Structure formats: structure tokens, C-alpha cells
């Protein structure tokens, strides 16, 4: 049976994951980065059955990702909002209580505003991406 400390930590981690999803939905990068440690590292990967390997689309630390997010307003981007539906599957606190790992499912929907056929697509909700978050936490 888990002790109360571990359960409390697990609930706090779940809350952080959900706060992160809300911040990302609002494109509030500052609040999202505030949840991340300075040693934060982010990567986007997927498994390719054709080559039987993981493919990396992006990998970088907090400084690199912050720089990219600061440049977003200078680029022509699709302003159709993204909405994340996140479900935390597991939170595993290490035996020493100093770290934890979590796995969450994420489904992202896009509400169309713009596009090639904006007069047809506007207001439509589309499945944008599905995947999993694999998060690591430092517990202080």
C-alpha cells in the first residue's frame, strides 16, 4: 500500500500535468515554462515501422525551446486554436522520493478558423494529433 506522502506527490504531479495542458491551450508559454525546471529537455518523437526506429522531429533544452516560442509571433502561423485532452495514466515516484516519472495520453483537437477553404472549414473541429507525454519530475 502506498504511503500518504507518495499519494500526495502523485496528485501534485497530476495537477502540474493538467496545468501544463491548460497553459499550452492558451499559448501561454511563460506559464508553461514556469512549470519546467532549468534542466528541462523536450523532444518530439515517433516510431517509424518502415525503418523500425524512433524518429526525432525536435529535441532541445529549455533555453532552445524558449527561443523558438519567442519567435512565434514573427512567423505566419495558423491561428486555429488547439485544445488538449490529457489523461494521466501513471505516476511513479522513486523509492528515495526525489524524482518521479509520469505517462499521460494526449489528444489534441484543432478548431478551424483559417485554411484553404475557410468558408467551408471555419468552425470545424479536427483531430490534430494523438500521442503520449513521458514526463520526468524533480521533487524538492
List where the protein language model places each region:
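Conserved aromatic-histidine-acidic binding/catalytic patches
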Residues: 5-8, 53, 121, 125
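Hydrophobic pocket/interface hotspot
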Residues: 20, 32, 65, 102, ...
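Short, low-complexity N-terminal intrinsically disordered segments enriched in polar/charged residues
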Residues: 1-38
Amino acid at each position: 500500500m502506498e504511503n500518504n506522502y507518495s499519494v500526495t506527490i502523485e496528485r501534485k504531479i497530476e495537477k502540474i500535468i493538467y496545468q501544463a495542458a491548460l497553459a499550452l491551450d492558451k499559448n501561454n508559454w511563460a506559464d508553461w515554462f514556469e512549470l519546467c525546471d532549468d534542466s528541462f529537455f523536450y523532444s518530439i518523437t515517433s516510431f517509424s515501422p518502415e525503418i523500425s526506429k524512433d524518429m526525432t522531429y525536435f529535441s532541445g533544452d529549455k533555453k532552445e525551446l524558449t527561443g523558438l516560442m519567442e519567435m512565434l509571433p514573427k512567423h505566419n502561423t495558423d491561428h486555429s486554436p488547439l485544445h488538449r485532452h490529457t489523461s494521466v495514466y501513471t505516476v511513479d515516484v522513486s523509492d528515495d522520493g526525489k524524482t518521479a516519472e509520469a505517462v499521460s495520453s494526449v489528444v489534441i483537437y484543432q478548431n478551424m478558423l483559417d485554411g484553404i477553404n475557410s468558408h467551408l472549414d471555419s468552425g470545424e473541429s479536427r483531430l490534430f494529433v494523438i500521442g503520449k507525454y513521458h514526463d520526468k519530475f524533480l521533487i524538492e
